[in-house]
């Protein structure tokens, strides 16, 4: 859980350090990163579910 907190803080810092259009892209990247952090906590559930596994292969060792 502490790792999740650190990743969210890092993503927030990256977003706040950019400006203009780059900030918009950074927010999208931060949103994707925080979504993956949440999925990482549920990795066993996701890897055993074919729909989740096909949507997020990076969690289960699949190709990107």
Curated annotation (Swiss-Prot):
Propeptide stretch(es), residue numbers: 18-43
Modified residues (Glycine amide): 61
Keyword Secreted: yes
Organism placement in taxonomy: Eukaryota, Metazoa, Spiralia, Lophotrochozoa, Mollusca
Protein name: Alpha-conotoxin-like Ai1.2
Domain-related comment: The cysteine framework is I (CC-C-C). Alpha4/7 pattern.
Signal peptide limits: 1-17
Tissue spec: Expressed by the venom duct.
